Amino acid sequence: MNDVSLRTATSADVPAITRIYAHAVTYGTASFELEPPDEAEMARRQNALLARNFPYIVAELAGAVVGYAYAGPYRDRRAYDWCVEDSLYLAPESHRRGIGRLLLTRLVAESQALGFRQMIAVIGDSANTASIAVHAAVGFRLIGNFQSIGFKHGRWLDTVLMQRALGSGDGAPP
């Protein structure tokens, strides 16, 4: 994917990010949101993560944003400060082209450089084999499943949990 470039997201990317996410919310099961957020809400979410120095990356192809990934807090309790949760979304035409793997690999590297020790993937829908596969390809291992905890598009959905150590992981205190 030599023609794909990765960079830190900016406010100028919010319209494209909003479109990508809206498609995932409306037609997919990767997100358990039922209504797509508007640009103002997506900008608020992006700003909140960037203000806390979490990595937020976009993939560009031919000058257009075709995917994005970010890390955010896993839970809002201090003992979790060394753990992040990843999110990864691609434009529909960008699936199965290696862009997700590029984004996730970069997200792992940036999160590790920031000193985080664990990354968690909370994958909506156990049938989302593409997301499970890309996470496995980047070193995540299956931790478990929550069964039938979401209801969307007329069916019950599982959530798959995957985890990857960053840096020394739990080999030493932070």
Feature locations, PLM:
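Acetyl-CoA-dependent GNAT
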Residues: 36-93, 104-105, 110, 165-167
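Conserved acetyl-CoA-binding loop-helix of GNAT-fold acetyltransferases
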Residues: 96-111, 133-137
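Conserved GNAT-fold acetyl-CoA-binding loop/helix
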Residues: 18-46
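Conserved GNAT acetyl-CoA-binding A-motif
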Residues: 111-123
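Conserved catalytic-core motifs of GNAT/GCN5-like acyltransferases
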Residues: 70-73, 122-123, 132, 136, ...
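A short beta-loop-alpha structural element at the N-terminal edge
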Residues: 5-17
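Glycine-rich phosphate/pyrophosphate-binding loop shared by adenosine-nucleotide-utilizing enzymes
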Residues: 4, 64-68, 157
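C-terminal "cap" of GNAT-fold acetyltransferases
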Residues: 148-174
